[in-house]
């Protein structure tokens, strides 16, 4: 368990609202859908009003994807202005969040197929502008060791505060979690466990340790059943 972290690492909301949070990662790691899942988690579990902001001006339809996720799930998103650069989008988002009474702003940054200097300098610039309370690395648990070395590279550039492991609903998640935590020394905060908007769960080191050791995860199963059926039916 100590390899995975001793305690649950909750989201840091101890900042003057709107609290900025940044999501970084490689392309294909599920960053944009994870942004929407995290927004829904903060709204449902922390009772926060969230604004989502896409800073990905490179991937075709990336901004539209986040806007669409916002519309489908009733989450506030910053209106898109074609051609606006990430630094300018950040400034506009900070003002708009204040005007809209948002408690938290989630910034979905651009990914790349691999780490490059341009990507890292852009993320560093964004970090300097928004001064995030949390910077989450979104990493695909199926990429294992690669994801772990990526985590280390991001940590060397920005103040990485947590990892969100996506596609963590398979057998490989335990090994990926151990290597990510061990190599990067960054706490894992959430697991993406499916496609639905509410398929994001807080990472519990003890439960994952039980899964790795083959002891099953009764607590998670009961919680999942309670969520699906409603607390009363379980009792």
What would you call each of these model-derived segments?
Residues 4-5, 23-24, 41, 69, ...:
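Aromatic-enriched hydrophobic runs in primary sequence
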Residues 90-91, 102, 114, 120-127, ...:
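Conserved phosphate-handling catalytic cores of large alpha/beta enzymes
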Residues 53-55, 78-81, 107-110, 138-140, ...:
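Structural motif
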Residues 29, 57-60, 84-86, 111-115, ...:
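Short, small-residue-enriched loops and turns at beta-alpha junctions
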Residues 1-55, 62-86, 90-99, 104-107:
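Primarily NTPase-proximal linker/entry elements flanking Walker-type ATP/GTP-binding cores
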